[in-house]
Amino acid sequence: MRPLTPRQEEVLQLIKTTMLETGMPPTRAEIARHLGFKSANAAEEHLKALARKGAIEILPGTSRGIRLTEPLEDQLEDQGLPLIGRVAAGEPILAQEHVEMHYKVDPSLFKPSADFLLRVSGMSMKDIGILDGDLLAVHKTTDVHNGQVVVARVDEDVTVKRLERKGRQVVLHAENEDFQPIKVDLATQPFNIEGIAVGVIRNADWM
């Protein structure tokens, strides 16, 4: 199969996810709705591109006429790291509904190995090279130490910061002087560690 663009990867991942959840591929309208296309015609163009690259076959005469060229089970074993999008309050970060797509990145490239990717929002960690739009490789663990860059959940928000524990308080430090530390009172505020940062993939590398 020829290499896919990030948008084509999104469409292909949606097809796989829908087939896993419902047993059938999505319609063009469903693809357009899930991925924010203006029309089903836009979805059709992406499907044609996937067919040209050998990822799928298009079966004429039916709205769900999409067939994967490789068995779904084989692809799932090698689908790579999940990219986590917006995380809903109170739900596990790796819940299926949070997974936007998968990137074919070998988890063992990172030490310790990565469990998922998180898209960085904002420039609060720019001084250590973590920029807006980057993909942060994360090792899922709650065993963390002062000074590590962690992915933490504070109240309803997921944030990337450098950890400092002070008794019953946690301070999350930005790596940008324009941002103030986030102080968390463990006695009164919900707080969870989701993992530690183990690498960064520059956003432009995927465009």
UniProtKB/Swiss-Prot annotation:
Residues annotated as site: Cleavage: 89-90
Pfam family, one: LexA_DNA_bind
Record key words, sorted: Autocatalytic cleavage, DNA damage, DNA repair, DNA replication, DNA-binding, Hydrolase, Repressor, SOS response, Transcription, Transcription regulation
Known catalytic reactions: Hydrolysis of Ala-|-Gly bond in repressor LexA
GO molecular function: DNA binding; serine-type endopeptidase activity
Gene Ontology BP annotations: DNA repair; DNA replication; negative regulation of DNA-templated transcription; proteolysis; SOS response
Protein EC: 3.4.21.88
Cross-referenced SUPFAM superfamilies: LexA/Signal peptidase, Winged helix' DNA-binding domain
Role played: Represses a number of genes involved in the response to DNA damage (SOS response), including recA and lexA. In the presence of single-stranded DNA, RecA interacts with LexA causing an autocatalytic cleavage which disrupts the DNA-binding part of LexA, leading to derepression of the SOS regulon and eventually DNA repair.
Family to which this protein belongs: Belongs to the peptidase S24 family.
Protein name: LexA repressor
Gene name as annotated: lexA
